[in-house]
């Protein structure tokens, strides 16, 4: 086992792409929400004097794990995920449920390279600003990516998927995908979970 200085575990080198507090250092907190079924990984982000947690939800699915709302994959975040993987199986699915939210889109390219066998599902209508670029230019591997609803939905035996929107914003659109997890009777909307 390699011992790494504590600050390096929280380091996120891509922070200039989305320069929000705490910039290059992202502490990750793992919480078990429903024993052996649902977890959250949280990091802080902020602007000026307001800092809020952002959440990636991890849900146990058939033979593995599904990640909703990707976060920047610091070593600390990956170490926490590896603990879950050792018990519950590999990351099978990564969901980006927002068309416009940068806070989750920014971590997806690096996370998809780490879990390079996971299927990626995207909210329809992905866009970037100031120039609307193709997914591959944003670092999102198009060969492993599928569009929610247009190409089906993942894990249909365990989830009911719904769309909030779309709403035209002019530059792009606002749309969020939510899901209801049948086994735990939980509703996952944005970064919120209703139990």
Protein language model regions, located:
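Long, non-catalytic terminal segments
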Residues: 2-43
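Conserved beta-strand hairpin/beta-sheet module of binuclear metal-dependent hydrolase folds
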Residues: 28-79, 175-181, 186-191
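Metallo-beta-lactamase
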Residues: 125-176
């Amino acid at each position: 086992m390699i011992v790494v200085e504590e600050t390096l575990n929280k380091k996120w080198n891509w922070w200039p792409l989305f320069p929000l507090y705490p910039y290059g250092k992202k502490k990750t907190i793992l919480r078990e929400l429903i024993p052996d079924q649902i977890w959250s990984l949280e990091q802080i982000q902020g602007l000026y004097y307001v800092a809020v947690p952002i959440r990636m939800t991890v849900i146990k699915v058939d033979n593995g794990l599904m990640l909703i709302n990707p976060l920047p994959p610091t070593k600390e975040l990956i170490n926490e995920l590896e603990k879950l993987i050792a018990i519950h199986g590999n990351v099978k699915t990564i969901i980006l449920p927002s068309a416009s939210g940068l806070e989750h889109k920014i971590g997806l390219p690096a996370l998809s390279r780490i879990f390079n066998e996971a299927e990626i599902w995207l909210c329809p209508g992905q866009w970037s600003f100031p120039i609307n670029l193709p997914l591959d230019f944003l670092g999102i591997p198009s060969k492993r990516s599928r569009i929610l609803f247009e190409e089906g939905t993942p894990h249909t035996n365990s989830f009911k998927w719904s769309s909030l929107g779309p709403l035209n914003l002019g530059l792009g659109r606002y749309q969020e995908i939510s899901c209801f997890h049948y086994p735990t009777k939980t509703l996952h909307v944005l970064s919120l979970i209703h139990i």
